[in-house]
Amino acid sequence: PASGCVIPLIPDGLSRGRREIQNLDAAAARSFVTAAASFLEKQVQQDGSFRYGYYPRFDRVIPGYNCMRHASTIWSLLCQYRITQKASVLSLAARSIKYLLSHALVYRDPDTAYLSEPLKDEIKLGGGGVLILAITEYLDLCSEEPRPAILRSREPLTKAPNAEIFHAKDVLPEQEALRRRYTEIACALGNGILSLLNPETGEFSHVLNMDFSLKERYRTVYYDGEAAYALCRLYRLTKEEKWLFYAKKAVDHFLAADYTRYRDHWVAYAMNEITRYIHRDDYDTFALRNARVNLDFLYKRETTYHTFLELLMVTFETYERILAENPGLPYLKEFDLPYFLRTIRVRADRMLNGFFFPEYAMYMRCPDKILGSFMVRHDGFRVRIDDVQHNIGGFYLYYKNYSRLLALGMPKDIPCEEN
């Protein structure tokens, strides 16, 4: 709004103190994505690392660093690029990839790589997964962009590349060299994931020491979905059957162990991807159940928990494809579409309680620093790069699919008591 305008604020309820968004449409969702992604752009430092985050009440910097969260945040920058086509965003993503490859990529042998956490002296399964996602998404956009920011390195593959960013006049040869090199790195990371997979059970080991010995067999369920999704994206990139074969092993374990109980958005991403290539009723059913059996919990959750909208929106994309490709699926009769769509609308509105509007930011020590970002209210209004990332992911998919959501019956508005 123009300076001097009076903006009415919601007087009570969960959304007390923020402006009411009368029409949370595609344009509104786009504005939240671009604002939050612009915040992330400002966090990219000269060496490609991010300013990790803040506790903004007292403008305290969050200590430490997490390379896995760094990798997944690159994905959010690329969502911004898909919307705005700003070349500077692609360059920032390139710089951020360079940082990881220079500081955190480790090789067990010439064909097997991992993303390490140097400050923790450990290797996480999920780290390799999200770095594959960042690389494959970046390569997708480079193939669409006529003059991308190229990362070039003459280092041998057995060493972490020391890349530099430049704009090439002769784009096509450089672009092809980039694609080959980054495909090699992504495949080496994929082999790292496979080294942590039990092919008999489909279970992953989660954390290694820096000498590649096992540190923790299990840490968090998120790693499983990240790894399976990454294997599926490697299949999309290379068309090598082995990636899909082993992704199937992991997904079979998700079904056998009923991973719907975890309400995991990464599992939703993995199922959305694998059902593009493997057409089985049990896979389609599980992909839909992963959201359906959790709708009551997602609908009633009062916090802004940032991965829930991602889970719902990824499942929406899966639902649409199943409806077109497998309309006879028996579970479609059990899938409560109106409740599902209503839950999406409620969660999208609930997420706004975590957006740093000016009326929230003004209470923080340095409002300008966190304006337009997303926060975690129940942890001191924390603003961390991965918090912003997940909010961008959910709203980007909401923006992308908004017209289809309305066409299938999502309400434009929700009752005020649900705000």
Question: Each PLM stretch: what is its role?
Answer:
Residues 24-40, 85-103, 144-156, 163-164, ...:
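Extended, well-ordered alpha-helical scaffold segments
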Residues 7, 21, 56-71, 111-128, ...:
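Solvent-exposed loop and edge beta-strand segments that line ligand/cofactor-binding
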Residues 192-244, 248:
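Solenoidal tandem-repeat scaffolds enriched in leucines and small polar residues
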Residues 11-26, 71-88, 129-148, 162-179, ...:
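Well-ordered alpha-helical scaffold segments within catalytic/enzyme domains
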Residues 93-94, 128-130:
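Acidic, Gly/Ser/Thr-rich repeat motifs that build Ca2+-stabilized beta-propeller blades
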Residues 1-68, 92-95, 103-111, 159-165, ...:
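Low-complexity, Ser/Thr/Pro/Gly-enriched N-terminal "stalk/linker" regions
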Residues 41, 45, 78-82, 105, ...:
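Sec-exported extracytoplasmic/periplasmic mature domains
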Residues 65, 279-282, 300-419:
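CBM-like carbohydrate-recognition segments
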